[in-house]
């Protein structure tokens, strides 16, 4: 390697009497100049460039550009970043392995070496997205849900077992173990990585990309990582660097301490609201300030977890004493902890009290000002003070959209032989769920202590509330049991339902039939309260119109109150055995009580639960597969089908064709999420995907979810834009994935319209508002549109991961000029679009788009090409990132 800076910076350090080689930033600074005030997150990127300098993908100019960021706290330069490893969950992991298997076949067909389709860096896939809350509220719930999960997903799990033996450096954490981000935080994350290279131990920062947007949770451990689409992760594991612009870094200063009774959840909802308002899309956020001295690592992880909700690429907490304390608690070895400390201090990556790096911009929060909060009814950044929730519920747009004028009456229903009344505003789901909060002992112990006080006073969960507890790791069950709090949670219906994502990703399972019927009969607006990180409309359950994010103790409190109209700050939750009112303040645990309970968490719990993390149950071990390099696709499978994206691929890319006469398939508003574009939850029987499954002999009870069927493109393309809450402005007043087939006026499903347009040879476009593609790092939100024939998406702004995914699938993202929108243009959706001269496209260039209206009049608008880097342009010209990777393997 021609690597003067690289070679000049090579040095050694000692940790626990072991010598490690590393690429020293202080040595590099002799040529680069003083970099001591560079944000710690950028120091991680700088080391990455230094270590990978080869004169081609990483040049000396790249390294100087990153070091020179300090001059203006900004740099307009593309860099090639190579993460140390890749993390996956099964909803995104299964289609990724499908792609890898199909890539092997494509390489073989084109005369290449199939063994090149193998991960070059470690890949951990954690199965956590498949368990559904079918059973709840009793001691058998966990076993029943696990049994159903294995039954429904057997075919997918066989496929993943095949992948385990077919691909090197590919590990699978079996179902029933935990949530990938929590397993990453508690076990997989190293903070500093070390490996043997040419008989030398080399140390470098632990970095990763993950196929789930909440990969950022690991930033709480001082590990730089973020979510990417599955296709980008596949490219990364095959050795392709992640192309990125050197980011702006927003400094978030935390001071003071949380007040008595305020939780980490209240803090993260406040931080999310502040950062959304500030505007951090595509930027790094780095936390600093004396508030970090006493902020537990679990609280840091909670804040880092929600980076996608505040819009940032990551929410980074530098390594310090709190990091080391957590690593010891969670069972990391003494050698590892010593290496982390020595390395971070040697590299200037260690957080010292009083550190004030240079930032692009800054915010500050005195944590003592944080108040008890929820977020809702349908966006994580919409924080509401606890006392204002009834007002926010009443004002929610869902109430206005629906038949709001009529006074909704309570509906009688019979459940288990008893008659009840289901009121409007009922809380029908109360779920302690999600890696965001179940990785945090203080809020879980608070929930258990609140449950204990409630049960002692004789309070009960309201009969219409479906309650559940789904921890992100088995350690949670151990410490709740050790603190003797499990029986009280069980008494209120918060029995263990599984170790996985469950309600947070829409796997809330069915509501009891009498409740579902009562909601439909009374057209009731009901709510879900969950300790999750997302509350987008239609995500948690199709019949639940408002979703509220809250801390675990507040989830328990809402299960007792049972209604969003009750003001938990002033109204009683219920009555004790004497008939006296009981208020939230009467059962809220003190800080001292919570601290005493948290002392029950021990290193032995972590070591016990992670000793055999890759082993799995007997049922998992009994899945046998034949060893083979290529997969034997089953023609009649409704779960796993060969990926169609490489079928007609040739060894050389064809020139990009201009887009002429494109029809608008959908015209959408602001904050359209990847869940709107490609839902993960339940499949309706009368939807195109539901009809496809029934035509292939699948009964409704076996539909499973869209997420579980991502290995079958036939289901997924039919499920594109099929969210029941999506609103296409081309069909006013209609909810769900419908559109008009133009030039006629017939209203049909988006899938059926797209297939007609394909037969007619008509390219397609999508028009949208701000924040298009926010939410999950869902690559099917780009793969599905590609299969429908969408060539271009024109929006007011894009969220980071989705923009990248569109390019990765060969779809052109264009941004309206400032001040121009679909509304200012008066678009009806009947226009035709021409986008020409695509062979001469340049990153960030102005692209003329010609609109031809129904009356024949024309208008040209100058859109901005959101292909931001030269590397992204190369991917687009190849028809997608994986096509580029395959062609590279052939040469």
Where are the regions a protein language model picked out?
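Acidic, glycine-rich flexible loop/linker segments
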Residues: 576-591, 803-875
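Segments forming glycine/polar-rich beta-alpha architectures that bind adenosine-containing cofactors
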Residues: 628-702
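Acidic/polar, glycine-rich intrinsically disordered N-terminal extensions of enzymes
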Residues: 1-82, 124, 619-621, 628, ...
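Long, structured ligand/cofactor-binding scaffold of large enzymes
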Residues: 54-257, 264-269, 372-375, 394-494, ...
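Extracellular/luminal Protease-associated
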Residues: 288-295, 533, 754-755, 759-799
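Mobile "lid/hinge" segments at catalytic clefts and subdomain interfaces of large enzymes
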Residues: 199-344, 350, 443-463, 495-609, ...
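Terminal amphipathic helices with adjacent charged low-complexity linkers/tails
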Residues: 82, 100-156, 286-287, 292-404, ...
